[in-house]
């Protein structure tokens, strides 16, 4: 039985799942909004929120931690130079999720995730 097993697996093993989360986080940071399934949006939201909280204090150590999580220098630069300064005085809640209907092919619930402000 799978009782009390937290987390979504998305039909992937560990490394492909981590790569999925990394790619979704990089896409959200670079484009500042994206459309994906509701489950993926809910999963990526706390990851991105933690990265923004980390980036609010711009130090070499925090940049290296963000680089280890994202693996994309453009995303790290945009996170620290563009996105994080907007949220310096805000204690959290940097992203929001809107439900936008269902996907035509399989009926999966879709969502728009974007940065606030």
UniProtKB/Swiss-Prot annotation:
One of its GO terms (cellular component) is cytosolic large ribosomal subunit. Pfam families: Ribosomal_L17 (PF01196). One of its GO terms (molecular function) is structural constituent of ribosome. One of its GO terms (biological process) is translation. Keywords: Ribonucleoprotein, Ribosomal protein. Part of the 50S ribosomal subunit. Contacts protein L32. Belongs to the bacterial ribosomal protein bL17 family. NCBIfam families: L17 (TIGR00059). This is Large ribosomal subunit protein bL17. The lineage of its organism: Bacteria, Pseudomonadati, Thermomicrobiota, Thermomicrobia, Thermomicrobiales.
